[in-house]
Amino acid sequence: SVDCSEYPKPACPKDYRPVCGSDNKTYGNKCNFCNAVVESNGTLTLNRFGKC
């Protein structure tokens, strides 16, 4: 699982460490994913690490 308690953040780093969300969308890194989790009110979850 991914700890998103420190999010949302106003800006994400550009590093590419893809994670796959439960929406079958590939997020570029944990920061981008966690921001989306917060926006979804916690309905978005981690599918797996790596591309979808």
Curated annotation (Swiss-Prot):
Q: Where is this site: Reactive bond 3?
A: 14-15
Q: Does the keyword Repeat apply?
A: yes
Which pairs of positions does the record mark as disulfide bonds?
Answer: 4-34, 12-31, 20-52
Q: Could you tell me where this protein is found in the cell? A: Secreted
Q: Which Gene3D superfamilies match?
A: 3.30.60.30
**Glycan-modified residues:** 41
Indicate where this protein is primarily found.
secreted
Q: Which InterPro entries match?
A: Bifunctional_prot_inhibitor (IPR051597), Kazal_dom (IPR002350), Kazal_dom_sf (IPR036058), Prot_inh_Kazal-m (IPR001239)
State the UniProt keywords alphabetically. Answer: Disulfide bond, Glycoprotein, Protease inhibitor, Repeat, Secreted, Serine protease inhibitor
Q: Name one GO molecular function term.
A: serine-type endopeptidase inhibitor activity
**What residues does the Kazal-like domain cover?**
2-52
Write out the GO cellular component annotations.
extracellular region
**The record's note on its domains:** Avian ovomucoid consists of three homologous, tandem Kazal family inhibitory domains.
In Swiss-Prot or TrEMBL terms, this protein is called Ovomucoid
Q: Which organism is it from?
A: Coturnix delegorguei
